Amino acid sequence: MAGTVRNVIIIGSGPAGYTAGLYSGRALLEPLMFAGYMSGGQLMLTSDVENFPGYPQGIGGPEMMIELREQAERFGLEVHDKNVERVDLSKRPYSVWVEGEEYRSESLIICTGAESIWLGVEGEEAQKGRGISTCATCDGAFFKDCLLYTSDAADDQL
């Protein structure tokens, strides 16, 4: 792939990545996305998304990511479920390495999102997406008037 220079490479597959793919696809830029091995990111562990426009009754995170991907692919987004190993932003075209192969692009959109920090306590794995929350601002309303335990007093949890 090193000989071909793409117009747009997108790294990350959350709502921002698929929105970038949708718009660049509609602009006929033939976007290429590296979604990672866990396409959809944190929303894949989210049972109810109620704070995203267009879903008045809410939607499950995995279902939302499927819809976003299908819509972006409809407009020409090419998705590879692979992890990016490294990038070189020192010169254009930019270089992106995936599984030892170099891809080059005039534009690079990086939307890798965030990653939750898990405690590693007993039972935690089984409860991901079923009561353990890693986003107080996203999920706080679900736990109104409940007794809660927080492991981090970040500003968004207070």
Positions of predicted regions on the chain:
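N-terminal Rossmann-like dinucleotide/flavin-binding domain of flavoprotein oxidoreductases
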Residues: 44-102
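Aromatic pocket-lining residues of Rossmann-like dinucleotide-binding sites
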Residues: 24
